[in-house]
Amino acid sequence: TLADGSKFVASVYGLSGSGKSTLTHAKHNGKYPAIKVLHDDAFIINTDTCASIALEPTYFDKTADYPTGCPDNKYLLSCQNCSATMDEDGKIQLVTEDIRNGNGRAIKSKLWSPNRVDKIESPVNAIFWIMKDPTIPPVIKLKGSSLAAVMGATLATKTSTAERVKAGTDLNALRIVPYANPFRTYPLANDYEKFKKLVEEKNVACYIINTGDFMGKKVKPADTLGILETIVEGKAKFEKWGPFEDMEIMPWGDFEVNLNDKDYTAQLKNAMQNRLTSVEKFATDKGGYDKLPDDAVAAIKKVVDEAAAL
């Protein structure tokens, strides 16, 4: 809720370790009259009313950032991949911070978040795809429903410590996880069409946020939160990004998007080509189970063709 009483509902999508919980639970130094948090993991959006509903009454959180004795830990209901020890007073204490083994987790009460709600009636205003892709500027605004939806379907990120990976996996290699949901049990086109509808029929805005590095320079949480606040407050000024017709960028801090840097443009072309290749593979892998409509292929191919001019 903003100072003028208007509401802005942001829907954020990213894998574990991408920064989505940091964005979700940020207090923004108390500058807004009210912040309501639906959930930082599992929720659905009604594509007719654009209201949002949480799917879980609790949180399933990493314990790596919450030291033993931390006051937040009193909200933990059960723990996994953690151990326990006895302190000098004979009390049992939880051992967190991934000391015993990696990916310590806990079921955390929703009471941990004082501003937590189970439903947001106000319609969603914007979708944010969170990526850790070093070719993506700190923020991009996507125009057109097909491009907005296909960029979510080709959400690229680095593997984090929150995930089990095969031995030998390159943790710096980008991989694509559609809509940041590795647990989908239905055809990918279902999600694609729903996100497309939100943008096309419900006028929901769509952005990509890079929470990793941009060409060697770290995008800090303060940058990302500042970008989010600028958008929420209606102060964001986006401008044309080189040859791209449907992607706009907003200058931020000292992040320089230099399209005359051949090393950068080569990596950018490669990153966009990888997205096109992924969409094309959806049509053949698993017998075409995750095939996307032709407009999805056309939208990302247009970006690849535009990038070729660089």
Residue ranges and their predicted role:
Residues 5-31:
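Glycine-rich phosphate-binding P-loop
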Residues 5-7, 31-33, 38-40, 47-49, ...:
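Short, well-ordered loop/turn elements at secondary-structure boundaries
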Residues 9-11, 27, 49-64, 218-236:
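Conserved, well-ordered active-site substructure
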Residues 11, 39, 44, 54, ...:
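Structured core elements
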Residues 33-106:
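Conserved nucleotide-sensing/catalytic segment adjacent to the nucleotide-binding pocket
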Residues 83-310:
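Conserved NTP phosphate-binding and transfer environment spanning the P-loop NTPase/kinase superfamily
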